[in-house]
Amino acid sequence: GIANLAKQVNAMGLKLGAYTSNGTLTCEDLPASLGREQYDAYTLAKWGVEYFKYDYCHHIPISRYAPLVYSISVSQFDSHPMEYSVHNAVLSGLARFMTDTKLPSGSYVSGLDANQGRITYNNVEVDEDGKYVLTVNIKKKGAYEKYLIAKINDDEEYEILFPPQKHYNLTARFQVIVNLKTGKNKIELFNPVTSNADSEMYQYRRMGKALKDATARVAKERKQAEKPIVFSICEWGWGKPYNWGAKAGNLWRTTPDIRPWWIWIKIIYEHTVKLYKYASKGHYNDPDMLEVGNGKLTYNQNVSHFSLWCMMNAPLILGNDLRNMSEQVKSIVTNRNMIAINQDPLAKQAKRVKKGVVDVLAKPLADGSVAVCFFNKSSHGAKAKFDLNSLVDDKYVGLQKKTEYAAKEQWSGEKLTTSGTISVSLEKCQSKVYIVK
C-alpha cells in the first residue's frame, strides 16, 4: 500500500508527495477532494505523505449567495439549545429585516450576499469553555447553493455550506461545531465571497486546516511526533494566491504549468521575481518544478534556470527522470552552494535590483552576506556591472557598508575583492551568482 511505499521512498533519501484537486475531479478526471477535505487529509496523514499538491481542475466556486436567516441556537451535545432570534442581533451593511409571519420569529434577515451585509450577535452566553453546536435556522429559498461564515469572537471562522433547498417545508437548519468561551460570545454571520479569488482562498484554507488537524490527529493516535505535510497550492496564479496563500498553505503556484522551453521559463521568471515581498519563512512563491535536464535546454540555460529558482526561494522539485540523469545535469541540481542560498534560514526571496538585458538580483542571507545574481536574458553575449554600495541603502537587502567587499562566484569558485563594483562578462543565457561579504 501507499504507507509502505512512503517508507521505501524515505529509505532512499526522498520524500513522498501526493496529488489531488480542489474540484470534483483531478486534471486526469479521477476522483478529487472538494467536499472531502477532512477525509482525504486524514488518509494522506495516515499514509505518511510529506508533500501535497492541490490542483484546480474541475473546480466549483463557492456560492456568493447567503441564506435567509431567522434565528440561531447554541447548545452542548446533551443540552437543550438556547435560541436567539435575529431581533437579538445587530445588522450592518445591506442586511435588513423582512417580515414573514409564518416563521417562529415573525421575520428573517436578507441582504447577506457577496459580503454586502452581516448579522452580529454580541450576547451569546454559555456557562463554560468548550465545543458547542451552532445551529443556523433559515427560511428556504431557491434551488441553488448558499454559504455563510460564522466568525466567533473576532477570531475563529467556521464554514457553513447550504445545499439547494426543496420547498416541501418552509424552514431548514444547518449546524457546525464551534468553540465558545465562558460568558458572552460574539457570533457574526456573513458571506465573504465576492470573487473567484475569495472562493479559492476559503477552499484552500479549508484543506490547509484539514491537513494540520489530520497530522496532529495521527500523531496523537500513534503516540509519535507529528509529521507535517507541506501544502502546495496550485491554482495557476489565477486568483493572485500570493495575497492569501500564506494563510492557507506553504507555497502557491504563480503561473500556469512550466514547460522545458527557454522562452516560457523566462516568462515564469519575469512574473515571479516581482512577487518577492510576499514570500516569508514557510510561505513561498512557486514558479513550478525544475525543468533542468529536460527538453532542449542548453547548459547555460539549465544553470540559469536552477540559479534563478534558488534565488527566488522556489521549491527545488526535480522534474527530470532521476533514474536517467547525466553527470552534467546532476552537477547542476546538486550544487550545494546554490542549494544553501535557496535554503538560507532568513528565507527572503531575491529582489531584482536592476532590470535590463542583464538582470541583477540580490538576496539577503542570514549571516549578513548577500547573494547577487547576474542573469543574461539575451541570446547573445553581454557585459554588465553593478555597484554593491547601492544595496547598502536598500532596506530590503541591507548589505553592510564596507570599504572593501569579498565576493565568491558559486558556480566557478572565482574570488574577487572590490570597493563596490562587480563587472561580469556573460555568455548568452548565462548566469553568475556571487556571495558578497
Predicted regions and their residues:
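Aromatic- and glycine-enriched glycan-recognition loops and surfaces
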Residues: 1-21, 34-38, 205
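Loop/turn elements at helix/coil->beta-strand transitions in domains of secreted/extracellular proteins
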Residues: 10-17, 47-52, 216-220, 225-230, ...
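Glycan-recognition surfaces
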Residues: 202-205, 209-321
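Catalytic cores of secreted or luminal carbohydrate-active enzymes
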Residues: 304-353
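Intrinsically disordered, low-complexity Pro/Gly/Ser/Thr-rich segments with frequent PxxP/GP/PP motifs
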Residues: 416-437
